[in-house]
Amino acid sequence: MNKKEKEIIKIILRAYDHHLIDQSAKKIIDILTKTGANIEGPIPLPTRKEVFTVLRSPFVNKDSREQFERRTHKRLIQIINPNKKTIESLMHISLPPAIDILLKKNQ
């Protein structure tokens, strides 16, 4: 038997603010459902946590340190068998500049 291969477009969203990334994912899903696309997601991916340790004093007191952290939140949206209208609507989506978007196509 010859199975029909699925064409999948993956949209990966990255941001430091989880509220902003959830709003953007909802906006993308609303636009794509209007085109009749088959969508999976938003799927939360692991959050990357970076910790930076800095000395508080410029000269002495090595025991006195300050720690900062930066969390990068990620969401995955999959579009299964997209049509031309779906791809065109993806090109015209406007999102905040704080959102990083990565598109991948798998077959």
UniProtKB/Swiss-Prot annotation:
The keyword Transferase does not apply. GO terms for biological process: translation. One of its GO terms (molecular function) is tRNA binding. It holds the Pfam family Ribosomal_S10. InterPro entries: Ribosomal_uS10 (IPR001848), Ribosomal_uS10_dom (IPR027486), Ribosomal_uS10_dom_sf (IPR036838). One of its GO terms (cellular component) is ribonucleoprotein complex. Keywords: Ribonucleoprotein, Ribosomal protein. Belongs to the universal ribosomal protein uS10 family. Part of the 30S ribosomal subunit. PANTHER family: 30S RIBOSOMAL PROTEIN S10 FAMILY MEMBER (PTHR11700). Involved in the binding of tRNA to the ribosomes. HAMAP family: Ribosomal_uS10 (MF_00508). NCBIfam families: PRK00596.1 (NF001861), rpsJ_bact (TIGR01049). This is Small ribosomal subunit protein uS10. It comes from Onion yellows phytoplasma (strain OY-M).
